[in-house]
């Protein structure tokens, strides 16, 4: 499971980049989507790597961002009661986050759960939004370090 966070805006960008971000449901800066580890998704992520930060997310971080930023239809917060009443297999956010991290379930297994997480800008800010993570910036592939970025954006 990959977490993809839009870091840069789309003003003066090519149409194919805008279309790919739209297919990933990334319409605004600091929005996050969780995508499965498939060749199709990785191809889309690589295409927009200069506008997003992405990496493998773990179960603890998934649990944190689902508890703090998970929303259902009507903009109500995601709760254990909502998951228990709308899912026959999961009884809490913790169980659902662990299943998501293992790849055993998807976000659409919970009806009414919004697929985009609207995150806060990172505490202490981005390093720079014009360089890759390897060069000391905030763009591109983070690997497991995406968990620290998501924790700052909780």
From Swiss-Prot:
Keyword Cell membrane: no
An example Gene Ontology CC term for this record: cytosolic large ribosomal subunit
Entries under InterPro entries matching the protein: Ribo_uL30_ferredoxin-like_sf, Ribosomal_uL30, Ribosomal_uL30_arc, Ribosomal_uL30_CS, Ribosomal_uL30_euk_arc, Ribosomal_uL30_ferredoxin-like
Any Pfam family: Ribosomal_L30
A single GO molecular function term of this UniProt record: RNA binding
GO biological process: maturation of LSU-rRNA from tricistronic rRNA transcript (SSU-rRNA, 5.8S rRNA, LSU-rRNA); translation
Keyword Chaperone: no
Keywords, in A-Z order: Ribonucleoprotein, Ribosomal protein
PANTHER family membership: 60S RIBOSOMAL PROTEIN L7, LARGE RIBOSOMAL SUBUNIT PROTEIN UL30
Assembly mode: Part of the 50S ribosomal subunit.
HAMAP family from the UniProt entry: Ribosomal_uL30_A
Family stated for the protein in its record: Belongs to the universal ribosomal protein uL30 family.
Name recorded for this polypeptide: Large ribosomal subunit protein uL30
Species whose genome carries this gene: Methanoregula boonei (strain DSM 21154 / JCM 14090 / 6A8)
Gene: rpl30
């Amino acid at each position: 499971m990959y977490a993809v966070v839009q870091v840069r805006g789309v003003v003066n960008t090519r149409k194919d980049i805008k279309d790919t971000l739209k297919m990933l449901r990334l319409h605004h800066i600091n929005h996050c989507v969780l995508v499965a580890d498939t060749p199709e998704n990785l191809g889309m992520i690589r295409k927009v790597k200069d506008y997003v930060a992405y990496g493998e997310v773990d179960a603890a971080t998934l649990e944190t961002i689902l508890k703090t930023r998970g929303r259902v239809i009507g903009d109500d917060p995601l709760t254990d009661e909502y998951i228990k009443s709308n899912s026959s297999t999961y009884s809490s956010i913790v169980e659902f986050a662990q299943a998501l991290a293992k790849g055993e379930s998807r976000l659409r297994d919970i009806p009414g759960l919004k697929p985009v997480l609207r995150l806060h800008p990172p505490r202490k800010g981005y390093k720079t939004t014009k360089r890759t993570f390897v060069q000391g910036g905030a763009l591109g592939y983070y690997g497991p370090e995406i968990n620290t970025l998501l924790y700052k954006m909780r």
